[in-house]
Amino acid sequence: MQIQSFYHSASLKTQEAFKSLQKTLYNGMQILSGQGKAPAKAPDARPEIIVLREPGATWGNYLQHQKASNHSLHNLYNLQRDLLTVAATVLGKQDPVLTSMANQMELAKVKADRPATKQEEAAAKALKKNLIELIAARTQQQDGLPAKEAHRFAAVAFRDAQVKQLNNQPWQTIKNTLTHNGHHYTNTQLPAAEMKIGAKDIFPSAYEGKGVCSWDTKNIHHANNLWMSTVSVHEDGKDKTLFCGIRHGVLSPYHEKDPLLRHVGAENKAKEVLTAALFSKPELLNKALAGEAVSLKLVSVGLLTASNIFGKEGTMVEDQMRAWQSLTQPGKMIHLKIRNKDGDLQTVKIKPDVAAFNVGVNELALKLGFGLKASDSYNAEALHQLLGNDLRPEARPGGWVGEWLAQYPDNYEVVNTLARQIKDIWKNNQHHKDGGEPYKLAQRLAMLAHEIDAVPAWNCKSGKDRTGMMDSEIKREIISLHQTHMLSAPGSLPDSGGQKIFQKVLLNSGNLEIQKQNTGGAGNKVMKNLSPEVLNLSYQKRVGDENIWQSVKGISSLITS
C-alpha cells in the first residue's frame, strides 16, 4: 500500500500529524532495504525487528554512525506494535495511516536482533505522543472540536483503549526456575485470575482469565495487579515453600474524584487482598469454607512516599490506611464472598488483624527525606502490634512475635534475629536512608510475617516497580538464608555470592514478565542514573553487574503512562 494514496482524503492537520508520526517511526526504526547482512543477535536480547532509511544503505555503514543503546530493537518493535494496535481500536482497524504503518513494520522484520540505536530509542518513546496527536487531528477534523479539547479527548481515548487491551490479555501464572550451588528454586507469580479452588477464580466479581493493570486507576471493583508470589526449593524429592506472600498495587483508586466512590473502591480492593491472603493459607481457607470463623493476620507493607509534594502518594497512603482501619476494628468480623470448588459463591467469616506499615524506598524518601514522618506515625502503631510495646532492641519481643516465640518453634532463632534487626533499624532510623540497602526494613517485615505464619503483603503505587524490587530482595534473602543459614546484617551489600543470587533472582523472579503484563514492556523503573550521582540509590552496587542492571532496567525509561 502506497502512503501517498491516502493523503488526498486527509485534512491538512491530519497530514501534518501523520508526517510527524511517519518521520518519528520510520527515521527511528530505519526500514531495511538494499544490501547487507543483518547483525547477530545481541547478548541477552529478547527477539523482535529491524530496519533502514535509504535505498542501498547497509547495516555496516549505517551502524558505524549510530550510537547503540542497551535495548533490543525487537523489544522496541513489540512495544510500538502494541501502541499501533491501541491506536487502531480508537481510529478503527482500517485506518489507512495505521494500516500503512503496520504494513511497513511487517516488511521491516528480519530474523536477527541487534541493540537499538539512540535514535530508534527516542522514536519508540515518542510514538505514543505522536499517535495521540494523530487521534486528536482526526477528532478535530471530524467533530470540529477546538485543538485543546480534541487533544484531551484523544489522550483519554488512547489511555482507556490501552488499559482495556492490557486488562483483556490473558493473565497467567509465571513460573521460573534458578539453580544456585546445586539447589533448584522455583519462583511462581500467580495472578488473581488463577487463584482457583475449582474451575473458576475465587473472587465474587470473576476475573475470567483477565486482570486489572496498574494503569486502571479508577477501578473500584478489583485490586490492581494482584498476585501471590512464592519461592520454593526442590529437596528430598519434593517441593518445599520457603516464602509466600501477596503483592498488589495501592488500594487507592486515586484517579476517582468522587470521595465516596474512592473510599468504597479502596475497601473493595482491600477485601480482595484479604481474599487472596486467605487463599494463600489453604488450611485456613478450608476451615472458613466449612463455616468456621477464622482469624487472619496480615502484615501490609506499603512502599509509597507519604508526601504530596510529588505525585500525591501521601493521599494514596491515607486512602490505603483508612481502608485497612475500616475493615479491622477490634473484634470486628467481616464477611467475604468466595467462589467454592463447585463455582458457587459462599460467604465466609474472618476476623482480620492487619499490621499496616508504610516504608518509603525511593529517592524522594531515602535521599530527600519526603514522607518519613507521616510513614513512621503509621509504623509505630504497626510495630507495637507486631513486636509489642517495648521496642528496645534488647527487649523480649511481644505482640504477634512474642506469641509465636512462646511456642518455641523450630524457627525460633530466625524469628528472634529478624525481630532484633527490625528494632535496631527502627531505633537508629536506618530506614530513613539508603545505607546500601533501600529495602532493609520493608524486606525484613515481610520475611518476619511469613516466619510467624502471618500473611505478608506489599505494594507500591503500581505494584510492579518498587513492588517488584521488594519481591526480588525478599527472594534474594530467602535463598541466601536457605544456603547459608544466616541472615544478612541490615545495610550490608551482598558479597559476591549474594550478588550472584540477586542477579539470578532479578532475571528469574517473574518481575520482568509482570512489568510487561502491565505496560507492554519489560523493565523496572527503579533502575535509573540520576544527576547528581549522590541522588542515586545503591542498586548498581547491590547488583554488581552492569549488564544485569541494564537487563533489569529494560525499556522502562521508554514507557509513559
UniProtKB/Swiss-Prot annotation:
It is found in: Secreted. The keyword Secreted applies. Its main location: secreted. Disulfide bonds: none annotated. A motif (CX5R motif) lies at residues 460-466. GO terms for biological process: negative regulation of cell growth; negative regulation of signaling; positive regulation of DNA replication; regulation of protein kinase activity; symbiont-mediated perturbation of host vacuole organization; symbiont-mediated suppression of host reactive oxygen species generation; symbiont-mediated suppression of host TRAF-mediated signal transduction. Pfam families: IpgD (PF05925). Signal peptide: none annotated. Keywords: Hydrolase, Secreted, Virulence. Changing residue 460 to S: Loss of activity. Gene3D superfamilies: Cell division control protein 42 homolog (1.20.58.450). GO terms for molecular function: lipid phosphatase activity; molecular function activator activity. Belongs to the phosphatase IpgD/SopB family. Contains the consensus sequence Cys-X(5)-Arg characteristic of Mg-independent phosphatases. Converts phosphatidylinositol 3,4,5-trisphosphate (PtdIns 3,4,5-P3) to PtdIns 3-P and prevents the transition of PtdIns 3-P to PtdIns 3,5-P2. It is one of the known effectors injected by Salmonella into the host cell and is required for invasion and for an efficient generation and maintenance of Salmonella-containing vacuole (SVC). Alteration of the phosphoinositide composition of the plasma membrane causes membrane ruffling and actin cytoskeleton rearrangements. This is Inositol phosphate phosphatase SopB. The gene is sopB.
